[in-house]
Curated annotation (Swiss-Prot):
The lineage of its organism: Eukaryota, Viridiplantae, Streptophyta, Embryophyta, Tracheophyta. It is found in: Plastid, Chloroplast. Keywords: Amino-acid biosynthesis, Chloroplast, Histidine biosynthesis, Lyase, Manganese, Metal-binding, Plastid, Transit peptide. Substrate binds at residues 95, 121-129, 147-151, 173, 195, 243-251, 273-275. Pathway: Amino-acid biosynthesis; L-histidine biosynthesis; L-histidine from 5-phospho-alpha-D-ribose 1-diphosphate: step 6/9. Binds 2 manganese ions per subunit. One of its GO terms (cellular component) is chloroplast. One of its GO terms (molecular function) is imidazoleglycerol-phosphate dehydratase activity. This is Imidazoleglycerol-phosphate dehydratase, chloroplastic. It comes from Pisum sativum (Garden pea). PANTHER family: IMIDAZOLEGLYCEROL-PHOSPHATE DEHYDRATASE, IMIDAZOLEGLYCEROL-PHOSPHATE DEHYDRATASE HIS7. GO terms for biological process: L-histidine biosynthetic process. InterPro entries: IGPD_sf, ImidazoleglycerolP_deHydtase, ImidazoleglycerP_deHydtase_CS, Ribosomal_Su5_D2-typ_SF. PROSITE patterns: IGP_DEHYDRATASE_1, IGP_DEHYDRATASE_2.
Length: 281
């Protein structure tokens, strides 16, 4: 990113004052209010250039060196993550043809067409509430039932997550969220540990929601767990409506996964494990 400060907009303060900027927060004020206004242009997420009367345009600060100076104290204040984490998978069998692309650092874009309308609706929840960009295209033998397409979409999503996470350096690793939807309340807790495990406790009262077989909800989640290598616990705390129970589950899962995949700036890019490595078991 580059920040340009117009020289005519800056008062003539003593150099001793100008050399001690106090950077308070990236999203609101980068300099004391007496320095405003200034023009800002953003180009790169991990690199910035500050241009002031004392800093010619060639002066640049990397994200690792961007610190706050306040009464002699120095601390890293702005975590930058230059690499977009994307996983892309194509899975083809005699039963299905599935393409999945996931951007963990997206904005919630959903583009899903699986031939199973209710599953598309749930994938929209994953994108919207996880702020992931989720693109899923699938064709399959839905004339038989939803089972094969449901399973293979989930297997591909889990593999795409595994790709996108990479070495998992700097992430939170753990996620925990409870989502209400009217009378339904679902709690999800997960660990991107590399060890696949599903603990599933949903009591869905009807066999179908629309044409969607509710028995395959557990199978969908188990398939994601198997290929992504996550530990996933799901608990139903309340709920009577099948649609609400399932949708609250996907919303809670999306928010917990968002927490787990986001960066922890205090880790400074280290692997969140005492072993020093997180890999698919």
């Amino acid at each position: 990113m580059e920040l340009y400060a117009a020289s005519h907009s800056l008062p003539n303060y003593p150099s001793s004052f100008l050399f001690k900027p106090k950077i308070t927060t990236f999203h609101t004020t980068l300099f004391p209010t007496k320095f405003a206004p200034f023009k800002a242009s953003f180009f790169s997420p991990n690199h910035l250039t500050l241009t002031t009367p004392m800093n010619p345009p060639t002066t640049s600060l990397s994200s690792a060196a961007f610190v706050e100076h306040n009464n002699g104290s120095t601390s890293t204040s702005l975590p930058f993550h230059p690499e977009t984490r994307v996983g892309e998978v194509k899975r083809v069998t005699k039963e299905t043809n599935v393409s999945v692309k996931i951007n963990l650092d997206g904005s919630g874009v959903a583009d899903s067409s699986t031939g199973i309308p209710f599953l598309d609706h749930m994938l929209d929840q994953l994108a919207s509430h996880g702020l992931f960009d989720v693109h899923v295209k699938a064709t399959g033998d839905v004339h038989i039932d939803d089972h094969h397409t449901n399973e293979d979409v989930a297997l591909a999503i889990g593999t795409a997550l595994l790709q996108a996470l990479g070495d998992r350096k700097g992430i939170n690793r753990f996620g925990d969220f409870s989502a209400p939807l009217d009378e339904a309340l679902i709690h999800v807790s997960l660990d991107l540990s590399g060890r696949p495990h599903l603990s599933y406790n949903l009591d869905i009262p009807t066999q179908r929601v629309g044409t969607y077989d509710t028995q395959v909800v557990e199978h969908f989640l188990q398939s994601i767990v198997n290929t992504s290598g996550m530990t996933l616990h799901i608990r139903q705390l309340a709920g009577r409506n099948s649609h609400h129970i399932i949708e609250a589950t996907f919303k809670a899962f999306a928010r917990a996964l968002r927490q787990a995949t986001e960066y922890d700036p205090r880790r400074r890019g280290s692997v969140p494990s005492s072993k020093g490595v997180l890999s698919r078991s």
